[in-house]
Amino acid sequence: MIEKSNNIYLSIDPIVERIKKNGEELPLINSEKKGIDYTQIVVYLVGLSDGLIHLASLAIYYLFKDHYRLTPYQVSLILMYPYLPFILKPIIALITDSISIFGMRRKPYLFLFSLFQSLNFLSLALVDLSLIQATLVLFFISLCASFCTTVAEALVVESSIGKTYSQGTNKVTEFIASKAVGSLSVAYFSGYFLEKVSREYIFMATSIFPLIISISCLFLKEKEYVTRKNIFKQMTDLIKFINTPVFIGPFLYIFVYMSGPDYDDAFFFFCTNKLGFRPSFMGTLRLTYGIASLIGIIVYRVFLKNSSLRNTLIFTTLVSFPIYISPIILTEKINKYFGISNELFVLSGGFLIEAITEIQLLPLFILTANICQEGLEASVFATILSVKNLGSLTKKGTSSLLTYLMKIDTYNFDNLSMYILTCGLFLLLSLSLVPLLPSEDQIESLKNKKIQK
């Protein structure tokens, strides 16, 4: 029989013990399984929908490439704007943690923003939009997705309260896996349908997925919440909680890792205009990337679950580099010397890097789920993700600039190999921040430290 430690941060149920000690209430959404666990179902559906809306991702690329006739650097520039709402996730999280609607912090936000997201996809399908209007619609789609995923992340943390470290790890990885499964489910069809039906039909079909969240969240049982802290007090608590080397070092690492230029948009033009790949094949590629993402999550759960944060970040960075620059084999036609087809070497690094970044974030999510201060569930998760998304936004800007400087356009790809190698070197730049990553002793110290409110 395992005996509980007197130290509330080393006990089997660390968060529950801390809450009881401070006389706080248990989470607003009951995580105990009594019959059907609607909370967990809603969490999985949000993750699944977040992946399923990638059905429209290729259609969006072709919309800007063919309908609006943009060049690679212009596409990169336009696609910066949908990242903005994800940078604002901490603010969104503070709103959902602090401001209740009809006494609830989760259900109303999920219902309203999933419904609004569906309407925005319908506008892409039914309205003849200008370039500016289409960009605004993408911004609002991302804003809605940001609200929905922020609420789901808070539910993951709340449902982890009272669980062991291993159980908390499983809940976090299952939520991320649900997104990967959703993306994987529609990856191939995102290209296949482009050859069979118009973009408008694809946008219309995609609008159905957020509606599923709107309907399912009505079954979510949420206790009435009485606001005890204003948003400014919440912000102060959030800054105090994350202002430690355990978080700051990884934040800087992930930002630098994500913010360098990325060749993905230029490579998309190369595949479609130079190599003549059809939409169905581009969809097949996305299926491959979806499988890679899911395998990455499985690898973490099986092999890296007990690895240190520092080792996980270093290992994934080193593994990603050769995969990331592999398209040089294709752009330099090296594969032709060995009689290997172009299709086998079309590995666009952007999607693989996103998958690896998910793995890099997992240790931070799991740590957060086990030590998060009550009332900041959404805020802390959102802050971690906003760092990644700020890096992604910066990446789009640096990609657009470097694409322009290297004179890569719709049909000129003379400098694409040099561009890919430059992007790869920027990827390795994050390794210079390894000394800033926290040691296991620092992480254990944070687990054992009582958070003052």
From Swiss-Prot:
It comes from the Eukaryota. InterPro entries: BT1, MFS_trans_sf. It is found in: Plastid, Apicoplast; Membrane. It holds the Pfam family BT1. It is a multi-pass membrane protein. Disruption phenotype: Gene deletion does not affect asexual proliferation and sexual development of parasites in the mammalian bloodstream and parasite progression through liver stages. Following transmission to Anopheles stephensi mosquitoes, by day 17 after the blood meal, gene deletion results in oocyst swelling and formation of unusual intracellular pulps consisting of numerous single-membrane vesicles, which ultimately fuse to form large cavities. The apicoplast and mitochondrion are highly branched and spread throughout the oocyst cytoplasm and are excluded from the intraparasitic accumulations. Belongs to the major facilitator superfamily. Folate-biopterin transporter (TC 2.A.71) family. PANTHER family: FOLATE-BIOPTERIN TRANSPORTER 1, CHLOROPLASTIC. This is Putative folate transporter 2. It comes from Plasmodium berghei (strain Anka).
